[in-house]
Amino acid sequence: MKRILFVLLVLALTLSACAPKQDASFGNILKVTDGTVEKTYSADDLKILGEIQASDKGVTYIGVQLKVLFQDAGIDPSTLSAVKAVASDGFTANYDPSQFLADDMLVAYARADGALAEDEGAFRIVLPDQGGKLNPRMLVEIDAIP
């Protein structure tokens, strides 16, 4: 019996050592692309671009305007027909120009009272007074569609 337990323990340790390691930065980097231009951002990078606040459902978020983020990435937001936000779990949300050019649409990296909640990830879209499906959490990529 002891021998079987020992073999199972060694097998379990071996399998756990062979498991792929998760990239520690996964989810802490935001990719912005239009298919030709691609730029990545950390929360510190976004803070440099300017800070605005927007409130949704009683929570005040801090972030950067989406159109400012596009301009920094070398993408002219006025030439886009749509924008797609992609979350780490594969969820996507699509926006038309009236939404993504709005002054209060932002990519949030914090709340006014501190960091984003753990279930929000490092970044999220905030489009005030819209349904939850247009405010994805765990944002990892923004695709600009010409």
Regions found by a protein language model. Name each.
Residues 1-16:
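Sec-dependent bacterial lipoprotein signal peptides
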